[in-house]
Amino acid sequence: MSELFSVPYFIENLKQHIEMNQSEDKIHAMNSYYRSVVSTLVQDQLTKNAVVLKRIQHLDEAYNKVKRGESK
């Protein structure tokens, strides 16, 4: 298992979300996951801003890698 909130973690979860939502377009499934995670991170009052920013950066990097078809 990848380190929590790392790029590999988000890549793994994006791919799982796509697989679980095969009836949807790949980009639509990715966008759904992305919005859900960002919303959760933004609402987390216990996490410092720098930590939230780093998590969102990792999510964004993972999103772009999965979209381009990269695996790591």
UniProtKB/Swiss-Prot annotation:
SUPFAM superfamilies: YvfG-like (SSF158388)
Protein source organism: Bacillus subtilis (strain 168)
Disulphide bridges, residue numbers: none
Protein name in UniProt: Uncharacterized protein YvfG
Domain of life: Bacteria
